[in-house]
UniProtKB/Swiss-Prot annotation:
The keyword Nucleotide-binding does not apply. The gene is IL1A. Monomer. Interacts with TMED10; the interaction mediates the translocation from the cytoplasm into the ERGIC (endoplasmic reticulum-Golgi intermediate compartment) and thereby secretion. Interacts with IL1R1. Interacts with S100A13; this interaction is the first step in the export of IL1A, followed by direct translocation of this complex across the plasma membrane. This is Interleukin-1 alpha. It comes from Canis lupus familiaris. SUPFAM superfamilies: Cytokine. Acetylated within its nuclear localization sequence, which impacts subcellular localization. It comes from the Eukaryota. One of its GO terms (biological process) is immune response.
Length: 265
């Protein structure tokens, strides 16, 4: 039986005597250029296709180091760090929209004026024709003859407003979205604290948003509770309160958490 090549032994042989072999991710990243500049033979295909379990059987290194090397060779880890230059991908959106357990870690640091020059590019609709209920089990409906929203206890949910959620790119780990009334061009637009949100008509779905950040909300989810935080005013959330229109608020006495009810399979 042919001996399985030892991937980690080959990797260590590619380092010069003056370079220290390290198992830490940051150290591996710093030495990556020198790694590729070394004049060593490329690894055999059979060696590159080994699974993590097969590799761990032929190496004395720890499991943590196995994961590091596999990641360096292009394998996608379940937990990964998004850098400031890396956008949220379609796979990330699927994970978020379908409530999987994937963890997207936040960048280590963000510049103070980071959001000032940020632009948000449209990706796609990630949820269609859903209803928002507050924790009093009241549904969001349109105010008769106006460009405002209110809440009502409904017997027939067909009378509730149906929303579409459009996802946009972000240069951090948050997910900015727009809330559009389904089958219309009316978008929810954040206002100042305690002011009612407006329904703003747009000629089309904005492909890039720079200044119109009132249309964007960071969608946050904690269990079955959903929150929509204004991108333009990050301390304010879409909120409801009895005998008031849907408005922007920091928290109590307003209700800022919602249940999202799907109306389509």
């Amino acid at each position: 039986m042919a001996k399985v090549p030892d991937l980690f032994e080959d990797l260590k042989n590619c380092y010069s005597e003056n370079e220290e072999y390290s198992s830490e991710i940051d150290h591996l990243s710093l030495n990556q250029k020198s790694f590729y500049d070394m004049s060593c033979d490329p690894l055999h295909e059979d060696c590159m296709s080994l699974s993590t379990s097969e590799i761990s059987k032929t190496s004395q290194l720890t499991f943590k180091e196995n994961v590091v090397v596999v990641a360096a060779n292009g394998k996608i880890l379940k937990k990964r760090r998004l850098s400031l230059s890396q956008f949220i991908t379609d796979d990330d959106l699927e994970g978020i929209a379908n409530d999987t357990e994937e963890v997207i870690m936040k960048p280590r640091s963000v510049a103070y004026n980071f959001h000032n020059n940020e632009k948000y590019n449209y990706i796609r609709i990630i949820k269609s024709q859903f209803i928002l209920n507050d924790n009093l089990n009241q549904s969001i409906v349109r105010q008769t003859g106006g460009n405002y929203l209110m809440t009502a206890a409904l017997q027939n949910l067909d009378d509730a407003v149906k929303f579409d959620m459009g996802a946009y790119t972000s240069e951090d780990s948050k997910l900015p979205v727009t809330l559009r009334i389904s089958k219309t061009r009316l978008f929810v637009s954040a206002q100042n604290e305690d002011e009612p949100v407006l329904l703003k008509e747009m000629p089309e779905t904005p492909k890039t948003i720079r200044d119109e950040t009132n249309l964007l909300f960071f969608w946050e989810r904690h269990g079955s509770k959903h929150y929509f935080k204004s991108v333009a005013q990050p301390k304010l959330f879409i909120a409801t309160q009895e005998r008031k229109l849907v408005h922007m608020a920091r928290g109590q006495p307003s209700i800022t958490d919602f249940r999202l009810l799907e109306t389509q399979p």
